[in-house]
Amino acid sequence: MAYFIDRRLNGKNKSTVNRQRFLRRYKSQIKQSISEAINKRSVTDIESGESVSIPNADINEPMFHQGRGGHRHRVHPGNDHFVQNDKIERPQGGGGSGSGQGDASKDGEGDDEFVFQISKDEYLDLLFEDLALPNLKKTQHRQMTEYKMHRAGYTANGVPANISVVRSLQNSLARRMAMTAGKRRTLHELEESLEQLAYTEPAQLLEEERLREDIAELRKKIARVPFIDTFDLRYKNYERRAEPSSQAVMFCLMDVSGSMDQATKDMAKRFYILLYLFLSRNYKNVDVVYIRHHTQAKEVDEQEFFYSQETGGTIVSSALKLMEEVVRERYDPSQWNIYAAQASDGDNWADDSPLCHQILASKLLPMVRYYSYIEITRRSHQTLWREYETLRDTFDNFAMQHIRDQDDIYPVFRELFRKQTVGH
């Protein structure tokens, strides 16, 4: 009777390792597809994955083929057209250099793009890869938690670069000893019997021959046990581990004045939802302060920030003054990493824009690690943008970007929060 032992460790997910390798190999194409898909779905929809499309041309495997030119010697079966040492003319074309010309297909046949589904975790990992809070520094109180990759023992699945040779050979030795223990014991007994039989009188040649055949058969069976098996392989394992880091607070300032139409407000909300997902995905215990403003500013909770219908005129400085008050009351700059993200359509009372410049330059920017401003408009820039441009030229911790339509949101977000390298 034959016995089949299922040693697959992935269960139903038999191709988990191949899937991870595929995601790594085509990461740039997948990220491009995600950046296009994010504008077609609700950003708050994180409970599901995403269907990703990759052009077939991008996943074609490299292949070797005969090039044009050169001399080749081949042996062909005989026929009535050629005799020995005849030279055959080279056929025209070939070598993959066709003209590519031809008539269009009437039935529309062709190769579709390769489409596959990624999970929620894979979607968020790719969405926020290589992003980080800028200028984050350790302070006295360490309440915020950041996730980093750490060694976590060994795993039976992985990529060749992470293979542990020593651990794999240890497993190989243990498996071979376990699988051949009974046969080696029997072999030792047969060898002892053969040695004793050699000294007996009279000689028992037939019995000696039988023992030698049994010993040879056992040695063949032991030798057939493979030296290394996929079951023996062990790879260095890495896992995301929470690490204490500096505590931080993010101020979200959103303009909800009458000049902000519904489409502009929706784009601002999408930006802030991306920011919220980024913070909650990559950091723990980050305080988020929501401030809505028109002629007056008010600190609100998350629900009111995203869904309140209140509107009015526009005085941007009211939000900046309120932010300063909150910082003074609750967030000591010596103990907190303070960040701010402001979204507006740029429309502001003309006399208020210089005041915004003054508040930022003298009070807020010296206290914050990073201040980002996004202006959502298709019109030409007004006084607020021009005042902020002078701040950008003066302060390294101030950044500003322009969003014209929905397709700009994700690229602008990545530009504002991309992970800084040593050279920056």
UniProtKB/Swiss-Prot annotation:
Belongs to the UPF0229 family. Residues 92-101 have a biased composition (Gly residues). It comes from the Bacteria. This is UPF0229 protein ECA2349. Residues 77-90 have a biased composition (Basic and acidic residues). Residues 53-111 are annotated as: Disordered. InterPro entries: UPF0229. Pfam families: DUF444. NCBIfam families: PRK05325.1-2 (NF003707), PRK05325.1-3 (NF003708). HAMAP family: UPF0229.
